[in-house]
From Swiss-Prot:
Alphabetized GO MF terms: DNA binding; mRNA binding; single-stranded DNA binding
Short sequence motif named Nuclear localization signal, residue ranges: 171-185
Biological classification of the source: Eukaryota, Viridiplantae, Streptophyta, Embryophyta, Tracheophyta
Protein name: Single-stranded DNA-binding protein WHY3, chloroplastic
Deletion consequences: No visible phenotype under normal growth conditions.
CC per GO annotation: chloroplast; chloroplast nucleoid; chloroplast stroma; DNA repair complex; mitochondrion
Record's subcellular location: Plastid, Chloroplast; Nucleus
Keywords noted in UniProt: Chloroplast, DNA damage, DNA repair, DNA-binding, Nucleus, Plastid, Transcription, Transcription regulation, Transit peptide
Amino acid sequence: MSQLLSSPPMAVFSKTFINHKFSDARFLSSHSILTSGGFAGKIIPLKPTARLKLTVKSRQSDYFEKQRFGDSSSSQNAEVSSPRFYVGHSIYKGKAALTIEPRAPEFVALESGAFKLTKEGFLLLQFAPAAGVRQYDWSRKQVFSLSVTEIGNLVSLGPRESCEFFHDPFKGKGSDEGKVRKVLKVEPLPDGSGRFFNLSVQNKLLNVDESVYIPITKAEFAVLISAFNFVLPHLIGWSAFANSIKPEDSNRLNNASPKYGGDYEWSR
């Protein structure tokens, strides 16, 4: 269960423009015409004392300044052509398989051109029962979404601690509330060799009552915890905020928001 997306490398071109100004009468006469690249003009003779002047102007610095501080047109093109990546981590055992995939947070564009977080990201857990030796029936998979707070509970578990999460997808949504119950339990194995994940699903709408159990070794659980800690700032959108910080904008942004509580606290 892996997908690989790639995009062809993009080439970036920069041009150097050379502007030659011929102003010496020794080289040009009043009847001469200079033609280059579709440009034609009449040359007016100057005094014999005038010297030949060559002016060279490079646009490379302009290009790199735009790349450094952001060019609106190039950023829009980058948004259109930037590749997307789909990742997940899977654990396969004899009775079931578990795949965990991160889901990105959602932002809304403001009139000012900035973006505001509207929904935090989460981790999607997919449990599939075994259908044979090294075969799993993903058509019967059960899913469970971990919020950032629930992820925090997992990463803070002690060696002998356990946790339990209860979800009702239809809670607060009318008559279907309580008809679907999902319970995820994470408990240490009796011999201390790891933990087990047990997902129980009761769906009265589809007449489903199923439980999927998968043991996780210490090493596998350590990989999960490391990945969870890494992805948390991205799920709450703080990584996007950190990447948008520019030193030259910090004073301007803080001064433009005097109602921000931090300004009042540290300005005392």
